Amino acid sequence: MDGVVVTYTKIAAAVAVAVVVVGWAWKVLNWVWVSPRKLEESLRKQGFRGNSYRLFYGDLKESSEMTRKAKLKPINLSDDPVLRVRPFIHQTVKKYGKSSFIWIGPTPRVQIMDPEIIKEIMVKSYKFNKPKRNPLVKLFADGLANHEGELWAKHRKLLNPAFHLERLKCMLPAMYFSCIEMVSKWDKMISKDGSRELDVWPFLQRLTSDVISHTAFGSSYEEGNIVFELQTEQAELVMKTLQSVYIPGWSYLPTKRNRKMKEIDRKTQSCLMNIINKKTKAMQAGEGSTDDILGILLESNLKEQLGQGKKNVGMSIQEVMGECKQFYFAGQETTSGLLVWTMVLLSIHPNWQARAREEVLQQFGNAKPDFDNLNHLKIVTMILYEVLRLYPPVDTLFRRVDQETTLGDITLPAGVQISLPIMILHHDQNIWGDDAKEFNPERFSEGVSKATKNQVVFFPFGWGPRICIGQNFALLEAKLALAIILQRFSFELSPSYTHAPTTVLTVQPQHGANLILHKL
């Protein structure tokens, strides 16, 4: 009898194991084959075109290889930068048209290029969340730009005061000091004949790093620079991670890349804790500002502690850390990219450089630029908008569809991703005219609304409720830096300049920006 019981027990256990294995196998099969084929069928019925689904990898292998090859050679100044920044997307749209899709592993990603549909997606940001990410990406930055729903609303509300108009005015002296420090170095480096070839890219990176360190975190460049270097290294690894299929649980495996990313994160957190502790002590002694970003974050953390973790009271220390990582990187990369492309394009178009300088000298002469008159620089603003059109900091935005959704005359099934290809839209001749690929700031002479015909076709900082919180900060810093540079130098492209726009989360010059600077 006992033997029979044991036999039945073994059979039951075997059946249970078999059920689990079959269930797991079905989930895998559904993920890598059944679901992708259903989604592809649904998209094709509605007129979307793209490559046929390839098991597991989709288009990722081809896309990664095209990106790798694109980075090996520069392009001409007149070439479309999308060719180098997003070569596979460029090829897909050229081959299949605007209503196209690509495969990110087993997930189809649809290109949306209709302004009205883009507007609806941007306005209903609560409905179209960002794609689920590999947990390792959170090591790089897990702040406001990545949050959704109530968490995003809480963080946005807490951080808004740091970017109010009066607060930006208070930041101007620190910005000015950093700019003067940079141009003073240039002045000393330039020879007696008044000219010198210089790669301005690392100087502009240091400038924006210094500004964000002082204005947002009350720390020195030396303290912040360690964080910047670590975050830059992490960004390269994040780009590689995003080019591979995410497999649940893979982030826990001790692969070389996983170990490296976690090691960088440990170092970053250690550096940030030193800055946080220093700031906390200064605030407790009544010496540190409480209305910069870090001050606001730490006051919020105090509320969290006093509220004993009650919902929406404040931020946990991990949330504070996530915001610090994000603002350190975004606050530096966005403005340095805008400035370097502005200097490159003004080197190519000396007539616009001269017009910008004339306006700056009319407003300020050789005196220190002030807040109110910086906002009256019409030509400089037109130039910055045109640079943001041609070289937006982020070239593409991504969203996901969690439930079947109708947008205009299309119905997107749950499970697909949405791509809003900013750079492609910014270069679209159907939107901007025959000169869409040319540098022409005059198109913004009557403002953004007139230039875009009130369509959502220009969104270098996003659009709608989730527009970049630091947009005005970045533009103020760029106007000030450009004004100070134009007061002191003229510049042109060096013969050694190599035009190689690439994306490392933001669009930047792969081989720097060699210019010839002339003292005025």
From Swiss-Prot:
GO terms for molecular function: heme binding; iron ion binding; oxidoreductase activity, acting on paired donors, with incorporation or reduction of molecular oxygen, reduced flavin or flavoprotein as one donor, and incorporation of one atom of oxygen. This is Cytochrome P450 72A397. It comes from Kalopanax septemlobus (Castor aralia). The keyword Transmembrane helix applies. Its EC number is 1.14.14.-. It is a single-pass membrane protein. It is found in: Membrane. It holds the Pfam family p450. InterPro entries: Cyt_P450, Cyt_P450_CS, Cyt_P450_E_grp-I, Cyt_P450_sf, Cytochrome_P450_Monooxygen. The chain crosses the membrane at residues 14-34. One of its GO terms (biological process) is saponin metabolic process. Heme binds at C468. Its cofactor is heme. The gene is CYP72A397. Keywords: Heme, Iron, Membrane, Metal-binding, Monooxygenase, Oxidoreductase, Transmembrane, Transmembrane helix.
